[in-house]
Amino acid sequence: MSYSGERDNLAPHMALVPMVIEQTSRGERSFDIYSRLLKERVIFLTGQVEDHMANLIVAQMLFLEAENPEKDIYLYINSPGGVITAGISIYDTMQFIKPDVSTICMGQAASMGAFLLTAGAKGKRFCLPNSRVMIHQPLGGYQGQATDIEIHAREILKVKGRMNELMAHHTGQSLEQIERDTERDRFLSAPEAVEYGLVDSILTHRN
């Protein structure tokens, strides 16, 4: 997770997006694969977490809530992390909307990706068998006058404290344990993520 007023050009570039064709009463209709899966209440969080991607995910969650506030939403995560404020906008929306958000880690959920993974509805947070999770403290960098650097240093410590509190709440670990474990990068396998409380179980196949 990075704490930064700067925004890198992190938007994912998808050169080839498969199209699917459906037969309807009005003939054939084509969808890109992500739009088709959105109809099944599936959202993908892949790549760096940044503002544009976060806005799209928030919009999709709000749309699905409006469509049916009683049905779960499925958030598939494969992310190395990203900007804290972008991730927090996704997190707050997950907590705000009425449908449960089930989170599934495929590949990796690192940094902000791990934070969003564990923020899913209790009992509905999953890892695929060979995925990995990485937790650590927020990263920050700021250039400017000494007084401004001091202001930003205080702010990143405040953000760190709040993120640790939320992580403790969702995992069931003590705040002190979270503080120790996020002092440096900590990688966890899928079974270790279950034991730690980041997820609830491992998905090996569909029922």
UniProtKB/Swiss-Prot annotation:
Keyword Ribosomal protein tagged: no
Keywords for the protein's UniProt record, in alphabetical order: Cytoplasm, Hydrolase, Protease, Serine protease, Zymogen
Record field: catalytic activity: Hydrolysis of proteins to small peptides in the presence of ATP and magnesium. alpha-casein is the usual test substrate. In the absence of ATP, only oligopeptides shorter than five residues are hydrolyzed (such as succinyl-Leu-Tyr-|-NHMec, and Leu-Tyr-Leu-|-Tyr-Trp, in which cleavage of the -Tyr-|-Leu- and -Tyr-|-Trp bonds also occurs)
CC per GO annotation: cytoplasm; endopeptidase Clp complex
Superkingdom of the organism of origin: Bacteria
Catalytic-site annotation from UniProt: 111, 136
Function: Cleaves peptides in various proteins in a process that requires ATP hydrolysis. Has a chymotrypsin-like activity. Plays a major role in the degradation of misfolded proteins.
Protein name: ATP-dependent Clp protease proteolytic subunit
The species this protein was found in: Salmonella paratyphi A (strain ATCC 9150 / SARB42)
